[in-house]
Amino acid sequence: MKLSIFSHCALDTIHLEGNSYEQIGGAASYCGIMAREFKFDVNLFTKFGSDFPKQYLTEHKINLINSESDKNTTKFSISISGADRTLKLENECDPIDYSSLDADGHIVSPIFHEISNDVLKKIKDNSNF
């Protein structure tokens, strides 16, 4: 089965107990990798900059559709203190463009402003639900 995912990849800096950790984040990364684990063919509609380690996606054989941007990747800083969490946007990448591809399903999971109403309408119009 073919799955199209529309979401930004992100870079997250997590601050916890005086230490900082950097990792990939965003629904695009997690949904894409998990869908491949379930043997879906994945087309990922996303945007990221040259600062994003895209090998995490390509080594899972995720098809990247018009994904590279001249801007840096969307980035969040996440501070964790006990049960409290603070999330700060540090950078916002380009919005995602729509491209039509044959898919059995679509996941639209924006993390911050990357899906315009026009793009969402085109996704819905191209879906069979």
PLM region spans:
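Conserved N-terminal subdomain of the carbohydrate kinase-like
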Residues: L3, L11-E22, E37-N128
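Active-site glycine-centered loops adjacent to acidic/histidine catalytic or metal-binding residues
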Residues: H8
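Short hydrophobic/aromatic-rich motifs at helix boundaries and adjacent loops
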Residues: K2-I5, G25-A27
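Histidine-anchored nucleotide/phosphate-binding helix
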Residues: G26-E37
